[in-house]
């Protein structure tokens, strides 16, 4: 019975269509989701699927600011954390109207979540 219960719990966290673990977004994601889609087309902001490893300002179909297009950043843990903490300091002149996430734990959770978006 114990094995059955553990198996059922594990199955609840697996996306069977893709064979990947389903990761719940952190609470702070709701702020991001007001402008960004996790999957699909650009909205007010660019979609964030596969953002990790992507060059800043390069998602097709989104009109980035000159500052973001010219930023010499490839998004990784460190650059995402810096940008999420203070977007204007990380990329001066970008158009994201967001002051940043002040809690380092929340920033870490957002970066962890962004790494799951494919």
Model-derived segments and spans:
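Positively charged n-region of N-terminal signal peptides that target proteins for export
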Residues: 1-4
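Boundary at the C-terminal end of the N-terminal hydrophobic targeting segment
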Residues: 10, 14-21
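Alpha-helix boundary/capping residues
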Residues: 11, 32, 55, 87, ...
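Sequence/structural segment immediately N-terminal to covalent heme-attachment motifs in c-type
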Residues: 20-43, 48
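Generic anion/oxyanion-binding catalytic loop in active/binding sites
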Residues: 24, 69, 96-99
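Gly/Gly-Pro-rich "capping" loops immediately C-terminal to redox-active cysteine motifs
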Residues: 37-76
